[in-house]
Amino acid sequence: MNRHDNFDFTLVCTVKFYRGKRSLPPDLSNGKYCPHFMIKTDTRYLGICFIEGQRADLETLVKSLVVPLYEEVDYSGLVCGTEFYIMEGQNKVGEGIIDEII
């Protein structure tokens, strides 16, 4: 059982990764890329995992499916239309928007 199997929702997002922050775009479809989202109007880190997505090129918008990771974290700020940064540690490596919650 994956740690993200405890949630009953998946986020459909459009994301892009910044050139100069990563040498290569991450693989969004293998369930192993687990950065954090930081809502643009907040400073809290929200642990997530990309479980499906188009092949990402740097600075290109791609669709992806994302699930939350931690039961004790409040993900209620992640609603349709929420804009966020993709964080790797202190580094903003990309950004995106939540298009749908399924």
Regions found by a protein language model. Name each.
Residues 1-102:
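C-terminal effector/interaction modules appended to NTPase cores
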